[in-house]
Amino acid sequence: TMAKGMGNGFPIGGISIAPKFKPWHGMLGTTFGGNHLACAAALAVLEVMEQDQLMENAKAVGNFLIEELKKIEGITEVRGRGLMIGIELPADQPDVKKNLLFKHHIFTGEARPNVIRLLPALNLTMEQAGQFLENFKTALKG
């Protein structure tokens, strides 16, 4: 299933199934299925993603971030794909996420108490990624 980003804030959801499963009429039913406005919003998102080459950008900026994060001392592991990145820290560094938020105004997710999850917008620039890295290094120091 997929949702959220499909409509860039407009409520929509979807499902994709493997070709080996043959859908039939009536197999899936939804309360709001076939909403024309939601479909138009999703189509507009796809058009912007293609026009602005957001997938290519996410791959390039994501690879840059992952490689640069791997160079920073104090990080246990960096894993991810594109701009979905997990930064695992030693358990004795509980304040990094708090420092990022309160000192640098950077909101991050959390996969576990010692794993910071990054999931920025697909149009994140290299410059913004560089700014994040500098702030992250400072947040690690306290």
Language-model region placement:
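Conserved N-terminal phosphate-binding loop of PLP-dependent enzymes in the Aspartate aminotransferase
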Residues: 1-142
